[in-house]
Amino acid sequence: MLHLRRFGYTAAMTDIHARVLIVGGGLVGLSLAVALGHAGITTVVVDRESPAELVAPPFDGRASAIAAASWRMLDRLGIAGRVEDVQPINEIRVSDGDAPLFLHYDHRDVGDEPLGQMVENRFTRLALFRTVAELESVTLKAPVTVGRMKRSPAGVEAVLSDGDIVRAELCVGADGRMSRLRQEAGIETLQWRYPQDGIVCTIAHAESHHGIAHERFLPAGPFAILPLTANRASLVWTERSDLAPAFMELPEAEFTAEIQRRVGDFLGPVHVVGDRFRYPLSLVLAHAFRSDRLALVGDAAHGIHPIAGQGFNLGLRDVAALAECLTDAA
């Protein structure tokens, strides 16, 4: 029996054949796997992180505002009904600081359904993992990395860190803003680093948020208060990159006071629940979304500023377009 020692371990080599190899098992990569799985397209998903870590409460602290159209897509894929702790977004209010006037979006102006849903990413991941587990045509390999990949007119061959070799007709790069697959394919990008960091945390508050999402434009950048279940909200606090580290190091009481000052008193007293996180903000736009035997989706194709909360929603549009192409070609 052939064994690999190249990656510092001994493992039996197994050939896995599939139509599609997805590198990156995040929200977009797994959504694509589900869409392809429902169409009976054999798919292998590879991700470096353990699924158990990805659904742990303190993993990254992030939540997503999923637009109504995106939620309908997740519903058709059998995912939406599995997602726990879903908070409807009934209204959106956008203001310049604490000005009394604001831009107002109300779901009642367009229909009965909410404008979108707020969900902690870990609950969406958990629903995706459960759905993938039921699809016989989808194989999830994690935690595993791609050691070497060869793309040729005949297809794709990827040697994985566990010794397996995946042979596929197409590779999909869902491996994020710093996409290794995009770089190896020589696809150039337009990118820059904003002079801002995003501070992300969850707060609990005394008064009801009534399903209203708030976006306030402050001198350092937008400050978003996004409703979650159980009188909680997800905060995305955009701050100058030179000041954000100091805010992150504040004692709990002082950090909470800074948040209370920015939120105001309409939610009553607030306190931070769980950890706080800081992310550098950047833009990455690939000059091309495809190459020979390669397609890019999600942040690997277009990573944007979180100001409008559209990252995952744009990724789902990639999923819909690519799944349609592959299904039509089946």
Q: For each predicted feature, which ranges?
A:
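Conserved N-terminal helical subregion
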Residues: 9, 14-16, 75-76, 85-184, ...
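Central beta-strand plus flanking loop segment that forms part of the substrate or channel wall
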Residues: 79, 178-213, 223, 231-233, ...
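Conserved Rossmann-like nucleotide-cofactor binding loop
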Residues: 28, 51, 178
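Conserved mid-domain beta->alpha element of the FAD-binding
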Residues: 33, 279-330
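N-terminal glycine-rich dinucleotide-binding loop that anchors FAD/FMN and/or NAD(P) in oxidoreductases
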Residues: 60-84
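N-terminal Rossmann-like FAD-binding beta1-loop-alpha1 element of flavoenzymes
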Residues: 18-45
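Conserved FAD/dinucleotide-binding core of flavoprotein oxidoreductases
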Residues: 104, 218-280
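Glycine-rich FAD pyrophosphate-binding loop
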Residues: 37-60
